[in-house]
Amino acid sequence: MQVSVESTSALERRMTVGVPAERIETEVNKRLQQTARRAKIPGFRPGKVPMSVIRQRYEASARQEAMGDLIQETFYEAVVEQKLNPAGSPSVEPKSFEKGKDLEYIATFEVFPEFTVSGLEGIKIERLQAEVADADVDNMLDVLRKQNTRFEVVERAAQNDDQLNIDFVGKIDGEAFAGGSAKGTLLVLGSGRMIAGFEEGLVGAKAGEERVLNLTFPEDYQNLDLANKPAEFTVTVNSVAEPKLPELNEEFFALFGVKETGLDGFRAEVQKNMERELRQAIKSKVKNQVMEGLLQANPIEVPKALIGNEVNRLRVQAVQQFGGNIKPDQLPAELFEEQAKRRVVLGLIVAEVVKQHELKADEGRVREMIEEMASAYQEPEQVVAWYFKNEPQLNEVRSVVLEEQVVDTVLQKATVTDKQVSYEEAVKPAEAPQAA
């Protein structure tokens, strides 16, 4: 087998492969012999059909199948011989395909980039330091109470934070428009659910009252047919209900799976969950900075094939997340290309750090991570046992731990500055990173 390779770009290779005619004929004859053993042709007993008849009937298809298999087989032999690492499938162009002659074809494909991760010493990390104070727990208790607010009907004028049950009809130029009318809608005044002026226009209204609101849709309204258009809404208030926060009692604590421990026990459970959230938030922000630092210090070119594969994965995820009757390939690729490129680049860089530093997932840390995740459930022992009985899920945890070990490796060389902040600032979501 003859092989020659040409570099047409930094990552693209054009490989010419020549397969000897003898190897082709051997493969064709092998297939014809297999066919002869099972062929059923009128006038001949099974397995006794003359090879000349078999060849006449089946040689063309046998040769085509043999050629296809030989191209696939010799392609992988050639890339191993040339020490190439293909990224994606090749584009194959036959040059010579004649009977009795050598098979020659050209395979064009991309390869993985070869690089060494560097610049770790220049990466700067700001690591947040925070604690969960009593005031933070108090604030969280308020949040939990508000999340479980109940509304009780009252006989008074509506005010902000009240929940109204309303019917409304919207019209533009005297004509009702699609989506502009509803009955029995529950609306909390001040929630910002409706366009500007709608909720404000119902403050002071009482049950049974009808109000007419003349409003204008905002210029950036999602429905372009309605954007910047004046509309008239006739609103009937069916009822007014005021918010009632639940008491901090055993009934409320039971909503969160905490029983018979009183307020002190509930506070302790809330604080434990907040501390876990705090650790995860700080760890996540450090990891994001490490990954951004690796990207900036190691600009690499990546195969288009890998980006395309990642775009397809992101399309599928988007459809699964948002649903609808849309197929993944109907979503424009450009919506996902920047995110896909970033993921691919980071994946290659992280893999190279693992390789350079000979990292393997620390099984002790794997167990610790599983036990921490399990602690959020009512039966943590069962959750831990489930993970260790399910290899795919266990491997996912190992991958996360390995990424953490990559972060630790970078932190050992990077410049790390600790910064004391409040709990709220520490758990606040970080800004989305820029695309690579």
UniProtKB/Swiss-Prot annotation:
The record's note on its domains: Consists of 3 domains; the N-terminus binds the ribosome, the middle domain has PPIase activity, while the C-terminus has intrinsic chaperone activity on its own.
InterPro entries for this protein: PPIase_dom_sf, PPIase_FKBP_dom, Trig_fac, Trigger_fac_C, Trigger_fac_C_sf, Trigger_fac_ribosome-bd_bac, Trigger_fac_ribosome-bd_sf, Trigger_fact/SurA_dom_sf
Gene that this polypeptide is encoded by: tig
GO CC terms in record: cytoplasm
A single MF term (Gene Ontology): protein folding chaperone
Top enzyme category: isomerase
GO BP annotations, alphabetical order: 'de novo' cotranslational protein folding; cell division; chaperone-mediated protein folding; protein transport; protein unfolding
Residue span(s) of domain PPIase FKBP-type: 161-246
Keywords: Cell cycle, Cell division, Chaperone, Cytoplasm, Isomerase, Rotamase
Known function: Involved in protein export. Acts as a chaperone by maintaining the newly synthesized protein in an open conformation. Functions as a peptidyl-prolyl cis-trans isomerase.
Protein name: Trigger factor
Organismal lineage: Bacteria, Pseudomonadati, Pseudomonadota, Gammaproteobacteria, Pseudomonadales
Cell compartments where the protein resides: Cytoplasm
Domain of life: Bacteria
The EC number(s) this enzyme carries: 5.2.1.8
Family classification: Belongs to the FKBP-type PPIase family. Tig subfamily.
Catalytic activity of the protein: [protein]-peptidylproline (omega=180) = [protein]-peptidylproline (omega=0)
